[in-house]
Amino acid sequence: MPIDATRRITAASVRAILLGVADPEIPNVSIVDLGMVEGIALRNGQIAIELLPTFIGCPAQQIIRDAVIEALAPIGLPVTAEFTFRVPWTSDRISPRGRERLASSGFAPPAEPADVRCPYCSSARVAIDSAFGPTQCRSLFYCRDCRQPFEAFKTI
């Protein structure tokens, strides 16, 4: 989407564009809603994005970085996107909309193990199958009511 050159670029307008950058593993949830965008700086005709990885070893960091740069390219300014480790990402950074979208995608949003609910039927009668899911940030659960397996994001 080409950006109107007469429109002033602000951190808010950059953040609005980044709402369209999805997590590669959960296309329904943006990196903004996951709380991964730590900073947006507009200096000397350049845009610098500071990102937080959900886990230090997250294999999707390069994919996310490239997607951020690609999404902001139509603005026509140089863009850098870098991950920082000076502030740790925690699951409480996930926005309410992000939590809703996680649930609608079949993922239980982060909660204490006793508070995990099935994203399909909302039952609290769930059991953890494995603390280790397909990625470091997720665990495997099973719903005793609807009998669906599901993944839950770990509370960090």
Q: Model-derived features: where do they sit?
A:
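Domain-level signature for proteins that mediate thiol-based redox and metal-cofactor handling
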Residues: 1-156
